[in-house]
Amino acid sequence: MYLLDTTSTAAISIYALLLTAYRSMQVLYARPIDGPAVAAEPVETRPLPAVDVIVPSFNEDPGILSACLASIADQDYPGELRVYVVDDGSRNREAIVRVRAFYSRDPRFSFILLPENVGKRKAQIAAIGQSSGDLVLNVDSDSTIAFDVVSKLASKMRDPEVGAVMGQLTASNSGDTWLTKLIDMEYWLACNEERAAQSRFGAVMCCCGPCAMYRRSALASLLDQYETQLFRGKPSDFGEDRHLTILMLKAGFRTEYVPDAIVATVVPDTLKPYLRQQLRWARSTFRDTFLALPLLRGLSPFLAFDAVGQNIGQLLLALSVVTGLAHLIMTATVPWWTILIIACMTIIRCSVVALHARQLRFLGFVLHTPINLFLILPLKAYALCTLSNSDWLSRYSAPEVPVSGGKQTPIQTSGRVTPDCTCSGE
């Protein structure tokens, strides 16, 4: 019994020290650099890069899809903008005919209909193969982007060393439930602490799919690796965003974060789909962490600490909780030290974030701690034990919608509706 108590106390104490050091460094590096005033940059004389926006869609709600496409159509980008909407074998194509018909009037929009569901990765590649812009922006079909997102991301890509950039994620349905409010805060932390700190060193480890821009010249050399990703000899069909970002870093490109390029995405409003999403992300993170390990030698010491420390920290936290619970069950003795450390660290973290963001709502992020301890940590352990499972988990969750007619062939339409292809896509 003494061993259990000692293990729990030691693990949580080491975890507290590690996390304090990590969070302090993260907050320091996430702060904007205040440099001396510089002269205004000369007016850009080079032609603006052409931007291709790719929107993969599968069984998307017509209203959500329409909002996504409207936000893209309203971009203020003065350069050439083309939009490729890929319907990845959706079963509700008849339900979104009006959406496709409306946007097919805009000559910037093209629609690609795939005859069967092949996954987001192959849907992206289908559009990349039919487009030719200098920059490629992926936008998820359940997301809406602010009017200046393309301009701000493209501006960051003026540096030829930058291969990929991402914007700041928010939850478009943050007001729906307590969980969506929590996820919105989770996104803010992931972007404005983790990604912002990584961006200081030009190595954002995951440019998130709802709003990620890539340099085509960099992307072209990586497509084969991206399309044929294997894990333990089996195709890996999820975690596209993280994997493509790691490939960019391996190829020697910088990946950065643009905090004022705002994208709002629909997030799960109940625990079941949220935990499915977390399981999928955990598997992807573990897989690509192994892939990223050789990169750490050439990156900043902070990034090595970031990659390794996060995983070790979670292991220490899990060890402390498990041994503490075992000690409680076997001796009826409450592990007060473990509880005190976790409670204090939670309160301090939420208070610091509330001050940093200047938003009192982050005090409510204390609710994330029990979810993390009793749901997400066990889920991550399960993910680690089932890394070979490539089930998308959410791909077949949409209701079955009958589609009339025979099997379709992939068709691209541009600017108008044609009877053969139901004309628009996504």
From Swiss-Prot:
Keyword presence, Membrane: yes
Reported impact of M166V: In strain: 41
Bias type Polar residues, positions: 406-416
EC code(s) of this entry: 2.4.1.-
UniProt superkingdom: Bacteria
Topological category with respect to the lipid bilayer: Peripheral membrane protein
UniProt region (Disordered), positions on chain: 401-426
Compartments in which it is found: Cell membrane
A GO CC term attached to the entry: plasma membrane
Primary location: membrane
Signal sequence interval, chain numbering: none
GO molecular function: hyaluronan synthase activity
Gene Ontology biological-process entries: extracellular matrix assembly; hyaluronan biosynthetic process
Enzyme class (EC, first level): transferase
CDD domains (UniProt xref): CESA_like
Assigned keywords, A-Z: Cell membrane, Glycosyltransferase, Membrane, Nodulation, Plasmid, Transferase
Protein's job: Involved in the synthesis of Nod factor, a sulfated N-acyl-beta-1,4-tetrasaccharide of N-acetylglucosamine which initiates a series of events in the host plant species leading eventually to nodulation.
Protein family (similarity comment): Belongs to the NodC/HAS family.
Record's protein name: N-acetylglucosaminyltransferase
Organism: Rhizobium meliloti (strain 1021)
